[in-house]
């Protein structure tokens, strides 16, 4: 077996049915243990996330909002444009429904990750917060060295996955899109991306937090508004589009079992790719937030899954479904970002250009968010002395990624990304009692706050 075949085999195993069951199963388990908390706490969580009065006095490096925007920067990426289209093509419109299901249970997973990340976070040699699965695994599961082993495994996979899925794959997508639409040489695009990446990440988490606090709201609103305009222009197709999604998710025609199975597989897989619930990446950003209690920031982190999948991915999914219902010629031969761009373009003048611009911002912000994730994993492994070197390497790889051919790199990074989830999910299941305890304590704080309000 050659190296490429080996990578593909390992990738198929890592992202096979067992992983998808583990990811979704952990979300269901945590949802039950936490009493479906994502339903009754979502309004309060959204209020916390977007409140003008951010916590500036508690321990931490950045605000609630900046921590959420940093996580969303890494989360809202090409998966929201290309990933949804891939799920739509390979799993049918019903895959979108299963993305919603994954997001619902993933909100509990994202909440639990953040609770543990903040509870077990520490201050590094530079005086900055350091947290995430590697720390809560080591501190929360100290017996027989299991936690340390799992923590090192997570950090190793995360440090290298950041260069692939969070860097080269993103800059390559930008270079391809800009070259296709504007004829710009990938070398030029790569150079510009490297300069802009360096300008932000060399300043550390505070610089990243400030940048993502501006870029993410702008790019999300820009893309969502464009999608809403298309939906308004095709308002008569919205209900039929939802009908198509639901009927495809529960297709009771001949061979429905295989059809439903395919829809579930691609919906869950692309849903996880999009919102990253269970991968263990987002809690690294949550650990940097200024907060008085793990539960408070965890609720803010939970909204990331809602905003990413229930809002942004739904916009993409509805546009794709409406374009499919209108049966525009040429769409059936496309997939990924090309299908999304063509669908937007068919339904609105300059729609394809909007998708291209959105893709550029989404991918660039992903590079910023993942640079911090990779840096913190690297720091856990070798200490703070190598951080600047890691940042410089990240900038250089951003340039290389824009000009390289990446099929093998994508599969390796994809595999490492999935491998991150395994130690993280083990930790979430074994430490679920801690999450429940912290949640009960925070609920008491909220009750007292309500009485004194």
Swiss-Prot record:
It comes from the Archaea. Residues 33-67, 112-148, 203-206, 275-300, 379-386, 431-453 are cytoplasmic. GO terms for molecular function: amino acid:sodium symporter activity. Residues 1-17, 90-92, 180-186, 234-258, 323-350, 404-408 are extracellular. GO terms for cellular component: plasma membrane. Maintains pseudo twofold symmetry even though it contains an uneven number of transmembrane domains. Changing residue 274 to A: Markedly reduces L-alanine uptake. Disruption phenotype: No growth on L- or D-alanine. It catalyses: D-alanine(in) + Na(+)(in) = D-alanine(out) + Na(+)(out); L-alanine(in) + Na(+)(in) = L-alanine(out) + Na(+)(out); glycine(in) + Na(+)(in) = glycine(out) + Na(+)(out). The keyword Transport applies. Catalyzes the sodium-dependent uptake of extracellular D-alanine and L-alanine. Can also transport glycine. Binds glycine and both enantiomers of alanine, while strictly excluding other amino acids. It holds the Pfam family Na_Ala_symp. NCBIfam families: agcS. L-alanine binds at residues 75, 79, 170, 273-276. Its main location: membrane. Keywords: Amino-acid transport, Cell membrane, Ion transport, Membrane, Sodium, Sodium transport, Symport, Transmembrane, Transmembrane helix, Transport. The chain crosses the membrane at residues 18-32, 68-89, 93-111, 149-179, 187-202, 207-233, 259-274, 301-322, 351-378, 387-403, 409-430. It is found in: Cell membrane. This is Sodium/alanine symporter AgcS. D-alanine binds at residues 75, 80, 170, 273-274. Belongs to the alanine or glycine:cation symporter (AGCS) (TC 2.A.25) family. Gene3D superfamilies: Amino acid/polyamine transporter I. It is a multi-pass membrane protein.
